[in-house]
Curated annotation (Swiss-Prot):
It is found in: Mitochondrion. It comes from Arabidopsis thaliana. This is Uncharacterized mitochondrial protein AtMg00860. PANTHER family: POL PROTEIN, RIBONUCLEASE H. Keywords: Mitochondrion.
């Protein structure tokens, strides 16, 4: 609470005021970005209500429904390891004129729904510890990742 007092005092010095109706202090977790993320002491997690919507999504019957599903799941792609590989059969369907549902698309749809049921809690970075930057390439793509160089095995972001 001492830090909070210091912050509010500095705000007041610069004529910056907090709206009491919009403030919440001492909360174990808060909703962030329009209730799409939950931030707690453990890290950042997906909103359970959004996960229920993804799991309950029916098999798409047209490209509009498929785009809706991919839009919703795509928002959480940083939580899903190998998201691009999983959704590739589904994104391929968007390139054609009509939706021709295949067995591969059905498997990808089920795999993605399964992946969102077990989303990890992403750890918040510790800015006091160093980061490790890795650069690599795979097939036709390249990637750069930044990882926290510490003993915590909790993922930061995929």
């Amino acid at each position: 609470m001492n830090h909070l007092g210091m912050v509010l005092q500095i705000w007041e010095q610069h004529q910056f005021y907090a709206n009491r109706k919009k403030c919440a202090f001492g909360q174990p977790q808060i909703a962030y970005l329009g209730h799409r993320h939950i931030i707690s002491g453990e890290g950042v997690s997906a909103d359970p209500a959004k996960l229920e919507a993804m799991v309950g999504w029916p098999e798409p019957k047209n490209t509009t429904e498929l785009r809706g599903f991919l839009g919703l799941t795509g928002y959480y792609r940083r939580f899903v390891k190998n998201y691009g590989k999983i959704v590739r059969p589904l994104t391929e369907l968007l390139k054609k004129n009509s939706l021709k549902w295949t067995e591969m698309a059905a498997l990808a749809f089920k795999a993605l729904k399964g992946a969102v049921t077990t989303l990890p809690v992403l750890a918040l970075p510790d800015l006091k510890l160093p980061f490790v930057t890795r650069v690599g390439k795979w097939n036709w793509s390249c990637f750069i990742t930044r990882e926290q160089a510490c003993c915590v095995s909790q993922p930061r972001v995929f």
